[in-house]
């Protein structure tokens, strides 16, 4: 999971995104008015993860005006535009996520994360794949074994929704953030009849506050 710095101006966004791709993308030209997958992948530090690319793109445009976002989307090439339509994020409050969230879909949530203590009474289980010989099977393990887990609080209702990220990422700040990820299934217990819930596997986040103008911008 990474913290990214959103674009503040449309010209900055276009210059960054219409970059010609990596050195081996010989058919892709910079500043040609077309943004393709190789160019988006370069600025996002990604290669073939199309779903994650769209998350990066959407979150990076957070502070642009609606008409400016439309200009950028209009410059995506045919294939990337279809990818954008396929993976466009649900924009939800934490209080809406359990009811409206769609498993395996991208989502962007806003709230204040509170780290769940591993020794607390929180229980939740996820399926993880394992290889048995040449056969892949799935077992259930506590989510806290694989992830840092948080309750993301909805400021309007004080309701919370579970978000999580890999343990090799830095702990999220205890402040209002905008976070992007993918909805995944979470079970309340190991029993087959256990309640099925959801959590957001977080990939990117930004501060909810717009940066001060005229400061240099660096994307991670």
Segments the model singles out, each with a brief description of its role:
Residues 1-220:
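OB-fold and OB-like single-stranded nucleic-acid-recognition modules
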């Amino acid at each position: 999971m990474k913290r990214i710095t959103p674009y503040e101006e449309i010209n900055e966004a276009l210059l960054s995104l219409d970059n010609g791709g990596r050195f081996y993308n010989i058919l892709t030209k910079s500043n040609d008015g077309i943004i393709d997958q190789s160019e988006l992948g370069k600025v996002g530090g990604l290669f073939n993860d199309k779903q994650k690319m769209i998350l990066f793109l959407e979150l990076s445009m957070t502070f642009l005006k609606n008409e400016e976002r439309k200009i950028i989307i209009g410059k995506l090439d045919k294939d990337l535009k279809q990818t954008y339509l396929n993976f466009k994020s649900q924009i939800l409050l934490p209080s809406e996520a359990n009811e409206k969230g769609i498993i395996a879909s991208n989502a962007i949530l806003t709230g204040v994360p509170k780290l769940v203590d591993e020794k607390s009474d929180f229980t939740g289980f996820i399926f993880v794949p394992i290889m048995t010989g040449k056969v892949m099977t799935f077992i259930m393990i506590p989510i806290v074994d694989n992830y840092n887990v948080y309750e993301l609080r909805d400021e309007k209702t004080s309701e919370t929704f579970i978000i999580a990220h890999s343990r090799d990422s830095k702990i999220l700040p205890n402040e209002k953030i905008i976070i992007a990820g993918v909805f995944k299934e979470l079970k309340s217990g190991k029993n087959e009849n256990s309640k099925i819930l959801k959590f957001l596997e977080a990939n990117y986040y930004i501060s909810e506050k717009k940066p001060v103008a005229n400061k240099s911008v660096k994307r991670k």
